[in-house]
């Protein structure tokens, strides 16, 4: 990642970032902002923006004070970044690197949200407990079990910390990760990151259903933020779930799913629709007329199920998963053409938020074992993070685990 002429440590980066003169953009594109402080972190139930930069970090320092200082610095920076504050270099410090990386100067907040999470490795791997945090690890915060057919790349999976930056302007999202990476210098190092474009789900009732790179509407039956009962039951950690520091938080699971376009593009329209279980143009379930028609899993025609047993919509349905649901908030991605193959390296960067990771695990087991979509996709990266609730004003993300 581009880090500028020189990295800035946590203390220096924070002091310089907040010490310049604040200027607000005068452009008219990408306005609007979401407050950083709330009962839950932003970027979860917030209306899904069009662009994402997801980054994970490994903590290189062994001092718990460095970790807490980093989280404090990140929180302070996040408050300013999400408000759209922009900083100019001090005219008296022209011999020093500028306080802000600069690529967002003149841009508005673009509804930027920053969501932070803690990976299992932060709480100790095997017998190692470098920060004395093992006692705070939620029992369910473990790497998901292996799933049939996946081909995970370890260098693009896992991580001690994650930051999800979402915005209507991709440069604003990039700028946020760039700034936070710069602040982390000397305490944590970027492990891997993923750029995403074009949301693949709707998180509020006012949003229309987008299409994924396979051309199908995606996330029709997603949980909506206005459905507070469903959010409470399926997304937000409750006081009885434990540990206390995760109450009002959630668990993030990310999966990088490559689409095998050579296979998919050669599949007939009927084959594609039977693979998904929906009509490609309208998004209606097979046997239905409109996108939001009830998915009838019992309907037959000519003695055959209208929605096949291995259709994605059947296997992912709450009706076949003991009522389990997850909040999807993924994005499309495209890296480049693979050298010598002519194949496009593109697909879905799947992100799901859930009250308990077992919700995702149970659903994914069914999909991995039986989903017709597996012939057209391959999972190449995976990560899980505990996302605590929003800190209180003046506090910092995850502060209670250091008390």
Q: Locations of the language-model features?
A:
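Long, histidine/aromatic-enriched segments associated with O2/redox biology
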Residues: 3-403
